[in-house]
Amino acid sequence: MVYREPFTGLIEYISRNYSGKIVEVCSGKMFRVAIELKKRGFDVICVDVKAIDTPDIRFIQDDIINPKDEIYRNASLIYSIRPPYELYKHILKIAEKNNADCIIKPFYGEIPEDFRLMNYRGDHFYIRKFSKNHPKILK
């Protein structure tokens, strides 16, 4: 069996399908995906309700239940890795309001409603498309 770094498929999917500004919400202290996407030329912003020191990644403290709209404006993608289930609807609302696609990589066993399951190169995550460049997957 070949060892794969965690989130390799997710990083590759985002790299192939998005450009420009992307925002990771509920980032916590795990920045592997954000750092790799920044290396690939993305304008990455990490957001969390708690102030966190980040390793060379732009970080903005924000409460996604009452978000500051300017943080998310013009993002092509809003994504979150293992956010609390009760925040899914708020993440989705931010993405829809900003016409950005939304990806959630949930904890094992959690399934976001109104999202499509993706299996990309062995990584499983859920997507909902809102961007002007893509048709909506689900209403």
Mark where each language-model region is.
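S-adenosyl-L-methionine
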Residues: 1-20, 138-139
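Short beta->alpha hinge that forms the Motif I/post-I loop of the SAM-binding pocket
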Residues: 49, 83, 107
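Conserved SAM-binding strand-loop segment of SAM-dependent methyltransferases
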Residues: 56-69
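A short acidic, Gly/Pro-enriched loop at the edge of an enzyme's catalytic core
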Residues: 69-77
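C-terminal substrate-binding/active-site "lid" region of AdoMet-derived donor-dependent transferases
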Residues: 86-139
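Conserved class I S-adenosyl-L-methionine
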Residues: 19-29
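Conserved SAM-binding loop of SAM-dependent methyltransferases across substrates and taxa
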Residues: 29-42
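Conserved SAM-binding motif I beta-strand of class I
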Residues: 43-49
